[in-house]
């Protein structure tokens, strides 16, 4: 059975950038990994997302189940998803035998600045602006983001750049006893 590392943090904290770098670091170590990016998968589950509480419940449960199936097939998985409520991550932990929570920490103002500059294919852009206009429910602004209480791995992206964060995380994922 393979492991699942769930990257959580506010939108714009660097989850996607770091996840891609971690994957490259792990491949160099001979460890194959698949990234499940919520922003990409959400479009299959909810083609016209409304980001409601009910929709989030369905999307996060589906994502956790996909990760479980892949890990049972021997595929290591990085889940790139905010999962703003602890219960979403707790349910995934209950479902997946080798679950590792990875907290990508960054203050809201830093996340907002990064998100405003975001260039991406799948991740929504301008979500913090929409939240300030009350057009969207955004974790950290008008919907709570519940930080992990005891993540297996934590990085602060105001203290480490993406490459440093990725090396730190990849080392812990490849040697969990560290």
Provide a role label for each language-model segment.
Residues 16:
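Walker A/P-loop
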Residues 105, 114-168, 176:
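Small-molecule kinase domains that catalyze NTP-dependent phosphoryl transfer to phosphate-bearing small molecules
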